[in-house]
Amino acid sequence: MNKQLPSTCGAPEHSLNRRAFLGGVGGFAGGLAGLDALGNPLLANQLEKRHKRVILLWMAGGLSQFESWDPKPGRKTGGPFRAIQTSVPGYRMSELMPMMASRVHKSAVIRSFSSPNTGHTGASVFALMSGDRQDTGTLRTPSLGCLLGRELSQPGLPDQVSFWNAAWPFSGGDKQHDFALFLGARYEPINIAHKLAPDGIQLPASLTDDDHRAREALREQLAARFQENRSGNATVASHGGSYQRVRGIMDIAGLFDVSREPLRIRERYGHSLFGQQALVARRLIEAGVPFVRLTDGWWDSHGENFEIHASKVPTLDRVMSALLEDLEQRGLLQDTLVVTFAEMGRTPQINAQRGRDHWGACWSVTLTGCGIKPGVIHGSTNADGTAVATDRVTAAQFFATIFQAVGIDHQKEYTSADGRPIRLTPYNTEPVRAVLA
């Protein structure tokens, strides 16, 4: 297990009581109803999206770009680790990531990501929900995962599953930045914290599956009568949908059981919880679940930054390379987009506690697989990593790139509950076309 190392963040959230992240069950997909795609452009677009999936590797707390994708060896900001040559000529990565360095020619790295918000909760909301929009109490946008789950949904499967291997250390938990909002509760994630599977998805020994299905059939009969004169009631529909979601997750309970995988596959991912959750993610993606988020925490290295990254980055390197290799070998990577992202990067300056603080001016993200041009190293920072040197990328542009990569029009417009138009990305946003295939 990774050694627990100190973090002395001065962010306002750190003054709140620390609580364990609470996992909940919610959000299953409906299917595309029998439609004839012949000659229909709208349906052709739906078919293009139908088998697309996204895995988000979320580095909670803020992975340091200096100790991963954008090292600055020999500079006062660089730290003690070497930079090593990668499989992309001229591009060097931290020595802590040798596995990814050997296969980064199959990924796209953006080294010029920039965000104005550097508080954990605010930055997470900014990154995961609003793109470059500042959400307010009257205008809020669904999270990236909820939007992708809605757009890529598959019949009988969860729209999104969200794993955590560490507690969100601020009041309110992850719920602060993973809302479906006007999309409806069915698109909210199944949240699984500190384990590999949701609780309570196995039938008790005293109840057979046939008995359970008979009870469900009776419940549906009674519910149909109740809904006869309430067909437009969203609350009633959501209540009925919750039963279907529970039944659906019970039907796929075996996907959460990694013991069904060959030992060599389990060993490839490693014994960390993050690694085993990544293996479950691959199983879910292979079955058609459209969006899985894997949250690895806690990267908030205000103290002992180099010790924390020396401990955690090799695990990320192993898990990420194993996941990408596994997806590729199974023929899944061409239809699966794998994203590494966080709420922020780390400061160039090294503080008195040998840590790096919050930093949004310039840091790194990656994209691999579906719709992405491999081997692209996009953007750059200056010699000390204190500013973007070329090709600044905003959160809105990054969102647009993700949507376009999986066949979703990033200019698509939804209507909120109060009738206001809300686009997937802000007006006048363009994707980063240099990384799109």
What is the role of each PLM region?
Residues 2-437:
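Ligand-binding pockets and gating/stacking loops
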